[in-house]
Amino acid sequence: MRAFTYKDGKLYEDKELTIPVHCSNPTYEILKHVKIPSHLTDVIVYEQTYEQSLSRLIFVGLDSKGRRQYFYGKMHVQRRNSARDTIFIKVHRVIDKIHKFIDDTIEHKNDVLFQLGVFMLMETSFFIRMGKVKYLKENDTVGLLTLKNKNIVRENRKILIHFVGKDKIIHNFTVHSSNRLYKPLLRLIGRKEPDSFLFHKLSEKKVYKAVQQFGIRLKDLRTYGVNYTFLYNFWTNVKSLNPIPPIKKMISTSIKQTADIVGHTPSISKRAYIANTVLEYLTHDSELINTIRDISFDEFIRLITDYITNTQTV
């Protein structure tokens, strides 16, 4: 696809806006159906028909903070939403294998295996984005793989993790001495080398290879983690709140709690991570509250996974 520069409703073949795209180009049909936000700059619209745009990337632009924003067609968004159900089930089915991998590597003498064990334990604890070196260089944003020793501070009997991630969001996590992650993380920290990477023996390739053995992607763990955390918050709220607020209010509260834990906005939690089928189930089962009061969290998770699986196979 060719990329056209957009300006004031017009398309151009060059960034200097000297070569206008002919009005007969089918890309103009797309502009009749989409609204490009006025606050975006450096907007690029991709050449395609309107029908093609329904399932593809349509345009890209920079927001007021210089962050690149991507806008997709309706069918692409629908597919992405339905994929969250599949991801949740897929990760849930292998999460015990992932925990066993952590058990087998977290105290390993081999530095690479040990660091992979700590990496996976941190990921399944906090569901942090992986982070790439190119993003660190381009935007000075940090992820799990690009954490440095200076991002980890030991204070009394706890470890504080502090870094600036995607979209300049500040992340803070605490690892208490009673946490399983505490001792392995202490072993990993290089206090004399603050600017060195925490996981200096790992690379994107090594991490991807380790995760691929479970038939998932690393980003799937974050999607699973957001849903798992949301469901735990919802279950806990049902158990602890009295009187019980309306379901939609409790969903909203649980989403906000989840966003605070994971480190993004409630809107992003709901729009980009939480499986729609999960929300559907919580909203439409009139007996759910009474059911949750009498079951454990593991039993609640089984209810959710059974519902998603049955919905997918209808």
UniProtKB/Swiss-Prot annotation:
Catalytic residues?
Y273 (o-(3'-phospho-dna)-tyrosine intermediate)
Superkingdom of origin: Viruses
In the record, biological process GO terms are: DNA topological change
Q: Which UniProt keywords apply?
A: DNA-binding, Isomerase, Late protein, Topoisomerase
> Which PROSITE patterns does the record associate with it?
TOPO_IB_1, TOPO_IB_2
- Catalyzed reactions per annotation: ATP-independent breakage of single-stranded DNA, followed by passage and rejoining
What molecular function terms (GO) are annotated for this protein?
DNA binding; DNA topoisomerase type I (single strand cut, ATP-independent) activity
Domain annotation Topo IB-type catalytic: ranges: 73-314
- The protein's site described by Involved in religation is found at D167
Q: Which Enzyme Commission number(s) are on file for it?
A: 5.6.2.1
Q: Which InterPro entries match?
A: DNA_brk_join_enz (IPR011010), DNA_topo_I_N_sf (IPR035447), TopoI (IPR001631), TopoI_C (IPR027362), TopoI_cat_a-hlx-sub_euk (IPR014711), TopoI_cat_euk (IPR013500), TopoI_N_vir (IPR015346), TopoIB_AS (IPR018521)
Q: Does the keyword Repeat apply?
A: no
Question: Function of this protein?
Answer: Releases the supercoiling and torsional tension of DNA introduced during the DNA replication and transcription by transiently cleaving and rejoining one strand of the DNA duplex. Introduces a single-strand break via transesterification at a target site in duplex DNA. The scissile phosphodiester is attacked by the catalytic tyrosine of the enzyme, resulting in the formation of a DNA-(3'-phosphotyrosyl)-enzyme intermediate and the expulsion of a 5'-OH DNA strand. The free DNA strand then undergoes passage around the unbroken strand thus removing DNA supercoils.
Would you identify the family this protein belongs to, as annotated?
Belongs to the type IB topoisomerase family.
Name-wise, this protein is DNA topoisomerase 1
Native organism is Rabbit fibroma virus (strain Kasza) (RFV)
